[in-house]
């Protein structure tokens, strides 16, 4: 399977909590899209059986969340962390054989990336250091285009990783269609003029 030069590797993780020192991964899902946000494959999902101490550390909120989603019932049949890391990386390698070429994408992706860096360092190391975080665009839309923000597609993922990823891809597609300049975009001359105007307006602050 050939690699696409503009691939995005979308990853969503479900954890026992958000404390990087105590909590562990429960579920990891990967969806690969092209530059146009079209999924190249249905995606890959794996459930992990964490240490018992991590399960015992789960608070009521997280326990209820994973119970309602059905994830809690799948954990005992989950694979080891080492097996999960191997399978996740093997899946990504089908589309991204070269390291450090494809950015990680997702929603509030910093949290997922922190857990990947700790528990799946080979996966994190294979991805480009840059990330595409849909929540950044959401926050800018809230400030600059509030009507766009309030009309964004409703999310109903139920805290399962695959549904969460697909909703994040859909959300970015929405922002792209309503906020970003439509194809074919500005000409080089228009972009140069906008760049010069911006530099001039910031000249007193950026020297």
Regions found by a protein language model. Name each.
Residues 155, 159-207:
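Acidic two-metal-ion nuclease catalytic site recognized across multiple nuclease folds
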Residues 105-110:
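Short, well-ordered beta-to-alpha junction loops that form the rim of enzyme active sites
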Residues 12-14, 34, 112, 133, ...:
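Acidic active-site catalytic centers that drive phospho-/nucleotidyl reactions
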Residues 124-128, 148-152, 181-187:
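Short conserved catalytic/interaction loops centered on acidic-Pro-aromatic/His motifs
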Residues 92-96, 111-129:
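Substrate-recognition/cap helix-loop segment adjacent to the acidic, metal-dependent catalytic center
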Residues 2-11, 15-104, 153, 202-207:
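Conserved non-catalytic scaffold segment of RNase H-like nuclease domains
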Residues 50-54, 60-66, 134-169:
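Active-site-proximal helix-loop-helix substrate-binding element of RNase H-like nuclease domains
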Residues 65, 88, 97-100, 113-114, ...:
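HAD-like aspartate-dependent phosphatase fold
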């Amino acid at each position: 399977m050939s690699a696409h030069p503009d691939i995005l590797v979308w990853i969503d993780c479900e954890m026992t909590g958000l404390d990087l020192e105590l909590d562990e991964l429960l579920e990891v899902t990967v969806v690969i899209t092209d530059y146009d946000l079209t999924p190249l494959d249905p995606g890959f999902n794996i459930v992990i059986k964490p240490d018992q101490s991590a399960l015992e550390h789960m608070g009521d909120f997280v326990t209820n969340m994973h119970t309602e989603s059905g994830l809690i019932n799948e954990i005992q049949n989950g694979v080891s962390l080492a097996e999960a890391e191997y399978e996740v990386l093997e899946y990504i390698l089908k589309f991204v054989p070269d390291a450090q070429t494809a950015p990680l994408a997702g929603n509030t992706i910093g949290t997922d990336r922190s857990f990947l860096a700790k528990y799946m360092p080979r996966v994190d190391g294979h991805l480009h250091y840059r990330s595409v975080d849909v929540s950044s665009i959401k926050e800018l839309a809230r400030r600059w285009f509030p009507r766009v923000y309030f009309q964004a597609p409703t999310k109903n993922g139920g805290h399962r990783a695959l549904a969460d990823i697909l909703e994040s891809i859909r959300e970015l597609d929405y922002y792209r269609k309503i906020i970003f300049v439509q194809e074919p975009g500005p000409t080089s001359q228009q972009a140069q003029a906008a760049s010069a105007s911006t530099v001039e307006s910031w000249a007193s602050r950026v020297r």
